[in-house]
Amino acid sequence: MPLACGHFQRLMIARSIDAHPGVVPQRCTYDGRMVDKPQWLIREDASVSVLVALALRQLLGIRVPEDLPALRDLAVRAPDAVEASPVIEKQWHEYWDMTVEPRAHPAGVPLELIDGFDTLVALPATGAEELRAAITPFAASALRYARGAHSRYVDAMTSTTGGDAYRAYASAIAEFEREVGRRAHSFELNVQVLPFSQRGIWWIGALSVAVSDGLRRDVVAFDSAIRPVIAELA
């Protein structure tokens, strides 16, 4: 089934074990007839919200998550700059979790949109005052960076995959099924393709990974890198 998810702004792939791989429209839900059959759902994106959160992390000098590298083409705080306070770091991490996997990390209080970030940043109405004050001066630069990075992802995926972006995932699942001798269990995976300064793939949530854009464009290397992720979930 050909890809039909215009401009790759969000790639959503699903499979019933009796169907060919294909793209699920952004608001599509599974057909009730497939409820009892194993199926998988993969969403690939370079989410502007995720990019904004990481840009703010870098601009504020926040170190968590410690294993995530810096973003390319975005200023890194000077070594002698004052580090973010533990309070801001904690509040940012909670905001990060809500951004990456909002269903798994619901806010305990109402959320409020932050001025200057359009609808891309929402923080708890109470308990995030320090973070709110810290990020406000960086709104314009973080938004500009995130939107530019997202546009480059869209252009790159359109030009390099030729409409076959799903094949890397389908191949990894098929190889997993051959190795273990069974169908893959039903699972969900979110993939964020990001302009990291280091090449690799990192878990950023229970059902979410971040992959460097350079690795994603390398068909052979990405196929090898995504297989352990598929095996973990399937």
PLM segments and residue spans:
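Charged/polar, solvent-exposed surface patches and flexible loops
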Residues: 90, 94, 98-101, 174, ...
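Active-site recognition of the HExxH zinc-binding catalytic motif
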Residues: 219-234
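Generic alpha-helical secondary structure signal
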Residues: 90, 129, 167-170, 174, ...
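Auxiliary, metal-adjacent structural segments of Zn-dependent hydrolase domains
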Residues: 145-209
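N-terminal low-structure segments adjacent to metalloprotease catalytic domains
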Residues: 5-8, 13-152
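Extended, well-ordered protein cores
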Residues: 210-222
